């Protein structure tokens, strides 16, 4: 009975979180502005993994994840970033299913590590799959609005993901993985800058609105 209650509570939490994600995406599409706050990276990853696992199990895909220890917080709309991660993990699972990989080679890996880009500290999120990879012509057009590798759907998923990342002053990219000439999968990654320290934020505000001086 206790196990059943725990399972029901988990299901209720997942349903509530899914509802929050849908509402935030609607708000973002209308305003194109994220609700950025100090966000804990491991918590975001945990929430995204919990929701994505449902879809990955449906495709018989194993999900593993690694989060580096003691990651600083990022300034982010956690619900939107969770949705980016969920989309990338689900896309990976669908690519694996399309490639008809054997059960021993059906995995998606999420890794979150610190990374510096052009001298700026940040956090890199990467989702790697063992799917069929992306043809070059698809890579070139991947983030165009309405372009899709799927036979159905509007193709807004990756375009929306990139818009969300870029609205956080981040960047997103995709690359195929190879074993010799053979494509063994694909890796999507995006980078977010760290939250500025409190003093830096105060300095920025002060510089944006300098005090008036009497002439």
Residue spans of the language-model regions?
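Core catalytic ATP-binding domain of two-component histidine kinases
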Residues: 1-206, 211-215
